[in-house]
Amino acid sequence: MKHQPDYTPIITAWQQLPSDCPERFVETALMSEMWKALGITPNQMAGGKIGNGLSPDWLIYRDQDKSKPPVLVVEDKKRISGFQALPDAEFDAKCRKYNLYKQAIGHPVPNANNNGIRQYLDKSKVSPHLLASYGLVFNGDFFQLWRRVDGLVLPMTPIQKVTAASIPLIMKQLEYCLNAPTKGLVVGLWNQKGGVGKTTNIINLGAELALNGKKVLLVDLDPQNDLTRGLDAKSPNYLEVYTNKLELNNFKQAKKILEKAICTRDFTTSLSKQQFTISILAGDGKGNFLKEFRESTAHTPKTKRDAIAKMFSLLAEDYDYIFADASPNTDILTLGMIFGSDVLLMPVDFDRRSLHHASALHHNLPKWRALRFKSGKGELPCGPWNLGLVFSNCPSERGAILENYISEELKKLKFTGKQYKTELKVLGQVKIAEFEKKPVCCFDSNPAAAAQLYRELASEVFLDHNFTDY
């Protein structure tokens, strides 16, 4: 596709668009100009039914070969007065309250039987050859891109206000979706309370995804190096020389340094004897170079934070999933992990403190996204988004009283994110696997026990349809 950098026709068409106009007029007067500027021809567009009762407004293909799945599915809406009057700083939060936006997403709306992006990217509802990787909701006032990674559907950008000044940026974002290589999902597992099973979860979720044919990288950013020792891995000190290359804008050499530091481990499951490989960007086993980098005065805190975040961006093209482990302390390594993650999965146990810390992170994520979006000048993808709570170290018998305390505490904390049904119990096989320095699927003699729980969690969170917009 040839990109036309002159967005004047789009800006002019938008400026001439009435503040109240029907959906069809938004499509013919404005969106047709957008597709033209992106070099998209009529042979790259389609419409029609993609599943039972599912008929999006547009399917956009990378080229004229429609035997491959579309790259983008679009749901557009009419323009109504009121959106342009919303303050820029509050546009995302206030736009979410409008039924028109909710309908575009596919949220339930009173007296409406609507489908939207969450249905059009649902792998359980859409024919595989019509299932897109990206989604767009648009009405001439709001613009938001969405992303699908296996079964997980999540925002790729905040809700952006369409203005003459923002049109060049949103066009570049569309161009990214149409042309950029697909990047893997960067997942941070974190809670400010320690002992909630984040490292154990990373190792075993990574293993289950690798068993499903996914290319998985685990990154140890915790100076305790539990992940490194937990898989008997070791990497050379890469951070200082890598950061120096970044400061020179030598991204190619910076990535090569990371690639050389990555080690791999091969495993075999205990029951099916299935082989799989996990890649690890490890520490040195003692956490020395992570501590040195954290405490170094050779780089500013912002440089160190951005270097960690950029690491994920550089490596994401080579993996399906990247899982990052960081200290419970909010040091610069942890902040870099949060800043560079697409999503955060928050392990909690049946403890009031872990719920408190998870809820605090949940409420702070919009600020992190806004900072990342602003500092990255709209670079995609933008995160982190809240993937939800996973209960770890669960007692086998907890009773209704404890369940009620947990539920009431989350209500008090105003936690509105997801809570996964799969709960990870304390089982001996997990401890045996830790001593053997392998994932539990390599030492689980009971398929209904530990490994099965991680298998179910990997499916619930990543492989089966799972929608989040927190």
Predicted regions and their residues:
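A short, conserved, highly charged catalytic patch centered on acidic carboxylates
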Residues: M1-Y134, R148-L185
